[in-house]
């Protein structure tokens, strides 16, 4: 740590985050949450290594720094029980990593992140130099199956000015990440109502641009996630988004530089997933550069 005085570090941190926000055209709140989340996850990795994996929108943020939508929470899948997770989070929050951050964390209710063993939500306040820096939400689930070895992700190096190394975390494999998004996007709720989560379509489009995917691995991940969660069948095609998604989808798409029309997002997502969910064995490899499947 370059700064011995917490107040000096906070002043330098605020200046760095303001510069980052201006350069990237993103709200300052995005950068603040990113830093606070990664410092908390660095503590959790120290307190409970190999006990948890990151999932959801924040995992996507680490896969494509500066390009993913702003997320208000972090989703974590724990390997044992919710009580163990709660204990580990409290212990992690109490760790002093010499970075002038301090955390206060408490359980605030239940959370649904698709884990078989249920989930709970935690609220954390991050402090720097004795003053509130950012408030965070952490959703923790248990009972989720890892379909393949997790990916190792590195947080953006926003604290290099203070000689603080970026956090390293494990996240669910990209194919499983996509499969869980497909499940959430196609799940119906209550009185057979479609999902209201426009963010899932945004995330699917962004992930389709990340890599060259093997058809069999992606198909297997989707089938296994749907079997594990047992809420509905794998669709034969990706359904179109509801009409009332127009406004929320536009806001999210404009934040990440996508076409603001939900129909355009659906066309891209359907090109990526329709052949996979239909089990079209003529498709073998997804080419992200051309947005098409090749034999």
What are these model-derived regions, one by one?
Residues 1-52, 62-74, 78-295:
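Structured mid-to-C-terminal alpha-helical surface segments
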Residues 59:
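Catalytic metal-binding/acid-base residues of hydrolase active sites
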């Amino acid at each position: 740590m370059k700064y011995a005085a917490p107040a000096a570090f906070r002043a330098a941190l605020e200046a760095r985050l303001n510069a980052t926000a201006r350069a990237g055209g993103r709200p300052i709140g995005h950068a603040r949450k990113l830093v606070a989340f990664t410092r908390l996850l660095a503590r959790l990795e120290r307190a409970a290594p190999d006990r948890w994996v990151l999932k959801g929108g924040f995992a996507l943020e680490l896969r494509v720094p500066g390009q993913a939508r702003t997320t208000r929470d972090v989703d974590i899948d724990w390997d044992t029980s919710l009580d163990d997770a709660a204990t580990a989070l409290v212990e992690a929050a109490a760790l002093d990593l010499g970075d002038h951050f301090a955390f206060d964390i408490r359980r605030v209710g239940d959370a649904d992140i698709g884990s078989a063993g249920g989930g709970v939500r935690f609220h954390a306040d991050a402090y720097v130099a004795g003053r509130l820096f950012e408030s965070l939400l952490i959703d923790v689930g248990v009972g989720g199956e890892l379909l393949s070895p997790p990916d190792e992700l590195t947080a953006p190096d926003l604290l290099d000015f203070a000689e603080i190394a970026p956090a390293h975390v494990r996240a669910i494999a990209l194919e499983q990440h996509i499969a869980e998004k497909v499940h959430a996007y196609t799940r119906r709720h209550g009185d057979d109502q479609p999902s209201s989560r426009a963010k899932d379509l945004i995330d699917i489009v962004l992930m389709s641009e990340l890599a060259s995917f093997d058809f069999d691995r992606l198909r297997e991940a989707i089938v296994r996630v749907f079997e594990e969660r047992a809420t509905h069948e794998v669709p034969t095609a990706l359904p179109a988004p509801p009409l009332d998604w127009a406004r929320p989808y536009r806001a999210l798409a404009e934040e990440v530089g996508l076409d603001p029309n939900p129909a355009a997002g659906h066309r891209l997502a359907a090109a990526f997933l329709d052949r996979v969910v239909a089990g079209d064995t003529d498709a073998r490899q997804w080419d992200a550069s051309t947005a098409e499947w090749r034999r």
